[in-house]
């Protein structure tokens, strides 16, 4: 709050980056490890759309840290905008968008406005097309409307297919106790220049790549 109100966006962003770095280090105390794998060249400049499966709230800190130079912003449910120290404030004021899925027309308009902002500022939009997190880690069906809206509003984007494994294990007991020695992995499965892809075919590719990379129980 101090950084945002008194020092502006850049200071706020750096404080969020380092907050999430230290959240990861705190989990290291429990033997939790985070491995990020990316064999692809991601442009240093230009907007991104990061498409990922969703297993727990512990997906968020490594995405923020490992993609920090791209300014990741999230599409999140509105209930997370209150009640979580630091996290809720960042969702409200850090450039992300909060939506109520029950109000679909308004939600899509908010995603449209969010996409325009990402395109203009050359940020990274992070979307979990499953809608809700998978409590057992197994992939759910991808919903297309939100992602297709981002495709329309961020035509210059590089699209990142990101697969997350094992973060669900950190939340399997309702976040307490947190199991010891969990190995969480984030792997970029592929990248696509949006302008070179047909949107529906790209959506199908992304779902196949990401869901296919999730470890089976």
Language model features: what each stretch is:
Residues 15-26, 30, 90, 146:
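Hydrophobic alpha-helical segments of integral membrane proteins
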Residues 23-48:
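A short, well-structured juxtamembrane/interface segment
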Residues 45-47, 70, 121-123, 157-158:
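Short coil/turn segments at beta-strand junctions that form active-site/ligand-binding loops
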């Amino acid at each position: 709050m101090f950084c945002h109100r008194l020092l502006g966006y850049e200071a706020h962003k750096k404080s969020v980056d380092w907050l999430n770095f230290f959240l990861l280090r705190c989990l290291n105390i429990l033997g939790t490890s985070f491995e990020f794998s990316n064999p692809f060249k991601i442009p240093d400049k230009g907007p991104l759309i990061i498409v990922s499966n969703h297993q727990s709230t512990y997906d968020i800190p490594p995405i923020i840290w490992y993609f920090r130079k791209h300014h990741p912003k999230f599409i999140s449910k509105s209930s997370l905008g209150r009640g979580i120290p630091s996290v809720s404030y960042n969702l409200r004021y850090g450039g992300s968008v909060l939506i109520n899925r029950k109000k679909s027309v308004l939600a899509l308009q908010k995603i449209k406005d969010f996409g325009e902002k990402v395109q203009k500022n050359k940020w990274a939009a992070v979307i979990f097309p499953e809608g809700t997190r998978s409590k057992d880690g197994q992939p759910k069906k991808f919903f297309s409307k939100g992602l297709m809206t981002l495709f329309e509003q961020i035509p210059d984007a590089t699209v990142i297919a990101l697969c997350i494994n094992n973060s669900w294990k950190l939340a399997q007991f309702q976040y307490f106790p947190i199991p010891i020695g969990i190995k969480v992995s984030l792997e970029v499965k592929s990248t696509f220049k949006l302008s070179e892809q047909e949107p529906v075919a790209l959506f199908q590719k992304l779902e196949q790549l990401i869901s296919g990379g999730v470890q089976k129980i």
